[in-house]
Amino acid sequence: KRGEQPVTNKRANINKNILRVQKLHARLANIRLAYVKSIVNDVVKTKPTFITVEDLNVKGMMKNKHLSKAVAQQCFYAFKTWLSTKCREYGIELRQVDRFYPSSKICSCCGQKKSDLKLSDRVYTCECGNVMDRDLNASINLLQAKKYTILT
């Protein structure tokens, strides 16, 4: 008849779009996992005697509604398991520092603890004259950490 539109199966189109979105999410997950594997391989191939990681409170970070999606996408568990597997394979000691170790708050030069450091402060400045990036200071402190547990 004239004027009538052809009958389409709307559910089939919805299912196609759902499948497209699922494939995109799977592709993103594969990209993240490949990135984790490449970073771990780059670190392990430098053949250090040990690697020190922090025991992060991921469960607590997931409670923050602003950060939870970003934290969930970081694949912390996959990073840690891949790192421990590669460390075992290459004979590298994997150390884990307690989550309450103040790695970013201690000066890597003089050892003085700065208690008023906020997360928004990206540059660490100490009274001894040490000025450096906060993450670099934390990594040096993790390198010099005395209390740790050996994972591999």
Features from the language model and the residues they span:
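Positively charged, helix-rich recognition surfaces that bind polyanionic ligands
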Residues: K1-T152
